[in-house]
From Swiss-Prot:
Belongs to the NadD family. It comes from Methylibium petroleiphilum (strain ATCC BAA-1232 / LMG 22953 / PM1). This is Probable nicotinate-nucleotide adenylyltransferase. PANTHER family: NICOTINATE-NUCLEOTIDE ADENYLYLTRANSFERASE-RELATED, PHOSPHOPANTETHEINE ADENYLYLTRANSFERASE. The lineage of its organism: Bacteria, Pseudomonadati, Pseudomonadota, Betaproteobacteria, Burkholderiales. One of its GO terms (molecular function) is nicotinate-nucleotide adenylyltransferase activity. Catalyzes the reversible adenylation of nicotinate mononucleotide (NaMN) to nicotinic acid adenine dinucleotide (NaAD). NCBIfam families: cyt_tran_rel, nicotinate (nicotinamide) nucleotide adenylyltransferase, PRK00071.1-3. The gene is nadD. Pathway: Cofactor biosynthesis; NAD(+) biosynthesis; deamido-NAD(+) from nicotinate D-ribonucleotide: step 1/1. InterPro entries: Cyt_trans-like (IPR004821), NadD/NMNAT (IPR005248), Rossmann-like_a/b/a_fold (IPR014729). The keyword NAD applies. Coiled coil: none annotated. Keywords: ATP-binding, NAD, Nucleotide-binding, Nucleotidyltransferase, Pyridine nucleotide biosynthesis, Transferase.
């Protein structure tokens, strides 16, 4: 009897505050380029390296669920928002691999995360457990931090097109009184814009836009 083919699973973590078209394009690129059977979107619970307060986990997970519905192979993974304490990627990887020890695992990250990876909790163990799949900035190939030069040959570079979109810019636009629908389709998917409008997320304080 032939053995079942090894499942290829990607882990895609982030604050997703909010999820935007850059996230979606990167996810679709990863699935296609890495031939993934499944890509798990993992909203961070307690993002220990973030200096600002995140939107509630309920809303961030809700926006991710809206964004990925209908996309084959995409799955929302709530483990980090349901876990107590800081959201360490190594814990997520260990738990995932314990549940499916025979799968091949990929960690999908962007250039910014890649550059900070040597500051992550137990990062040396992390890079032995997964294949890093890295999207370069502005459509360029990713550049490794010096600590990762020795394992550069084991890293998958994801061919991302240049994209001028960020969660920071989206939040600033909405906080200044802009509408979510005006960000469609270049910055956010329609379903995410509808979710933002439905719950009045990132809106300026009641009483109007703060004075400049």
């Amino acid at each position: 009897m032939n053995a079942s083919p090894q499942r290829r699973i990607g882990l895609y973590g982030g604050s997703f505050d909010p999820p935007h078209m850059g996230h979606l394009v990167l996810a679709m690129t990863a699935v296609q380029h890495l031939k993934l059977d499944e890509l798990r979107w993992i909203p961070a619970g307690v993002a220990w390296q973030k200096e600002r307060t995140l939107l509630s986990a309920t809303h961030r997970a809700g926006m991710v669920k809206a964004a990925i519905t209908g996309h084959r192979g995409f799955k929302l993974d709530r483990r980090e928002i349901e876990r107590n304490g800081p959201s360490y990627t190594i814990d997520t990887v260990r738990e995932s691999q314990l549940a499916e020890p025979n799968a091949k695992w990929f960690l999908v990250i962007g250039q910014d995360q890649y550059e900070r990876l040597p500051t992550w909790h137990e990062w040396r163990e992390l890079i032995t457990r997964v294949t890093l799949a890295v999207a370069g900035r502005d459509g360029k190939s990713p550049s490794p931090p010096s600590e990762l030069l020795a394992v550069w040959h084991r890293i998958e570079a994801l061919p991302m097109p240049p994209m001028n979109v960020s969660s920071t810019a989206i939040r600033a636009h909405l906080a200044a009184g802009g509408t979510a629908q005006s960000l469609v389709p270049d910055m956010v998917p329609t379903v995410v814009a509808r979710y933002i409008d439905r719950y009045h997320l990132y809106a300026p304080p009641r009483g109007g836009v703060p004075a400049a």
